[in-house]
Every structure is written in structure tokens, then in C-alpha cells.
């Protein structure tokens, strides 16, 4: 590896960390503003009804999910719909960290609630446009620019690794 290649690889890693931090900030704000839709079925319903209001689509799966044929078909359809409607798409490689960010801290565990609680489907997460302008949010602007740059390099669904805390 030459010095130029090493420097380029190091810059790419730093850029991915920055994009991961921006995604974390966008999810935090969207959660507090209640502009998140969680679940493959719920996402499909929203995309069918109001695709113009969706600014970001996250697809999350681990290695076990990669063998789930039905889920992969859903992902393919969602990706195609998002590309057709100019919706930015990111693939999250660590769904466990995504679950930590999206699940409410005050939610009780199944043992505490006295029954079996169903874990929400976090394979697909949509962030919708809040009433205020999306361009006022620098983190969302950074994600949109990253998605656009990735498309220019023929990477239509870039993979992001959310930073562990």
C-alpha cells in the first residue's frame, strides 16, 4: 500500500465515522419530533401514501437476516421504490446499535411489564420531513450529500456502521 492509498483509506474511515455521527443525530432529532416510521410493513404503507414526505430510508440487517429471502425481497422492492422517488437510502450494518438509538429508554422490558412484549421490526426505518425545512438541519444535509456522492460513484445503497458508544 502506497502512502497515497493509505491516506485515502484513512480519509474514507474518518468520513464514515462522521456520517455515522450525523445519522445518529438525525435519528435522535427525528425520534424527538416523532418523524420516524419503523417496520417494513409500516414503511411500505407510508411510502404508498406519502412518498414525497420521506427524506431518508434506512435498511438494517445482520448476517442472519441476509439469509431471509422474504426480507430480501421486501428490501429490493423498497430500494426500487426509493430510487424511483428520489428518496435517500442507507444500509445500516449494525442493527443492534440502531435498536439502541430508536427504542425508548423508558420502555419496560418484557419481564418488567408482566408479559411478553413484541420487539419492533427495525429492518426498515423511514425519516419523514418535519414541518420545518430539512435544509436547516446540518446533519441531515450531510447525510443527503453523502447519499448523493455515493450515487455518483454508482453506490446506490451505501453501507453505514453506526458508531458504538
Swiss-Prot record:
InterPro entries reported in the protein's UniProt record: GADD45, Ribosomal_eL30-like_sf, Ribosomal_eL8/eL30/eS12/Gad45
SUPFAM superfamilies: L30e-like
Coiled coil: none
Source superkingdom: Eukaryota
Factors inducing expression: By various types of DNA damage and growth arrest.
A biological-process GO annotation: signal transduction in response to DNA damage
Pfam families found in the cross-reference section: Ribosomal_L7Ae (PF01248)
Main location class: nucleus
Recorded GO MF terms: kinase binding; promoter-specific chromatin binding; protein heterodimerization activity; protein homodimerization activity
Keywords: Cell cycle, DNA damage, Growth arrest, Nucleus, Phosphoprotein
Positions of post-translational Phosphothreonine modification: 2
Intracellular or extracellular location(s): Nucleus
GO CC field: cytoplasm; nucleus
Similarity comment: Belongs to the GADD45 family.
Known role: Might affect PCNA interaction with some CDK (cell division protein kinase) complexes; stimulates DNA excision repair in vitro and inhibits entry of cells into S phase. In T-cells, functions as a regulator of p38 MAPKs by inhibiting p88 phosphorylation and activity.
Subunit composition and interactions: Interacts with AURKA, PCNA, GADD45GIP1 and MAPK14.
Name assigned to this protein: Growth arrest and DNA damage-inducible protein GADD45 alpha
Organism (species): Rattus norvegicus (Rat)
Record gene name: Gadd45a
Amino acid at each position: 500500500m502506497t502512502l497515497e492509498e493509505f491516506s485515502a483509506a484513512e480519509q474514507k474511515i474518518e468520513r464514515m465515522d462522521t456520517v455515522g455521527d450525523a445519522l445518529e443525530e438525525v435519528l435522535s432529532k427525528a425520534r424527538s419530533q416523532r418523524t420516524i416510521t419503523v417496520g417494513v410493513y409500516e414503511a411500505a404503507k407510508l411510502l404508498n401514501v406519502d412518498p414525497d414526505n420521506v427524506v431518508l430510508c434506512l435498511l438494517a440487517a445482520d448476517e442472519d437476516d441476509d439469509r431471509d429471502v422474504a426480507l430480501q425481497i421486501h428490501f429490493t422492492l423498497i430500494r426500487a421504490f426509493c430510487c424511483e422517488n428520489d428518496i435517500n437510502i442507507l444500509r445500516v450494518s449494525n442493527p443492534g446499535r440502531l435498536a439502541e438509538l430508536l427504542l425508548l429508554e423508558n420502555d419496560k422490558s418484557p419481564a418488567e411489564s408482566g408479559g411478553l412484549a413484541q420487539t419492533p421490526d427495525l429492518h426498515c426505518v423511514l425519516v419523514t420531513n418535519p414541518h420545518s425545512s430539512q435544509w436547516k438541519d446540518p446533519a441531515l444535509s450531510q447525510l443527503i450529500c453523502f447519499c448523493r456522492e455515493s450515487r455518483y460513484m454508482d453506490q446506490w445503497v451505501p453501507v453505514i456502521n453506526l458508531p458504538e458508544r
